[in-house]
């Protein structure tokens, strides 16, 4: 018997079928687009050193 892992949508936490899901890891196109909008709005950020602005480079 093959075990299947449970997967959950990163946005709404609904259980998601992984196989044949064109939106994975999301449950739907809606959750996928909400997540993309959060990246575009800079609600999500990857930690790292702050990049100096162009004005600071002139010194």
From Swiss-Prot:
GO process terms (BP): regulation of DNA-templated transcription
Cofactor-binding details, from the entry: Binds 1 zinc ion.
SUPFAM superfamilies: Glucocorticoid receptor-like (DNA-binding domain)
GO MF entries: zinc ion binding
Tree of life domain: Bacteria
Cofactor(s) named in the record: Zn(2+)
InterPro entries: DNA_gyrase_inhibitor_YacG (IPR005584), Znf_NHR/GATA (IPR013088)
Binding site for Zn(2+): 9, 12, 27, 31
UniProt keyword list: Metal-binding, Zinc
Subunit structure: Interacts with GyrB.
Task performed by this protein: Inhibits all the catalytic activities of DNA gyrase by preventing its interaction with DNA. Acts by binding directly to the C-terminal domain of GyrB, which probably disrupts DNA binding by the gyrase.
HAMAP family linked to this entry: DNA_gyrase_inhibitor_YacG
Family that this chain belongs to: Belongs to the DNA gyrase inhibitor YacG family.
PANTHER family: DNA GYRASE INHIBITOR YACG
Entry protein name: DNA gyrase inhibitor YacG
Species assigned in the record: Geotalea daltonii (strain DSM 22248 / JCM 15807 / FRC-32)
Lineage: Bacteria, Pseudomonadati, Thermodesulfobacteriota, Desulfuromonadia, Geobacterales
């Amino acid at each position: 018997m093959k075990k299947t892992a449970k997967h959950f949508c990163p946005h709404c936490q609904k259980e998601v079928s992984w196989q044949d899901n064109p939106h994975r890891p999301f449950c739907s196109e809606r959750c996928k687009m909400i997540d993309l909008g959060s990246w575009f709005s800079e609600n999500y950020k990857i930690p790292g050193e702050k990049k100096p602005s162009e004005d600071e480079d002139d010194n």
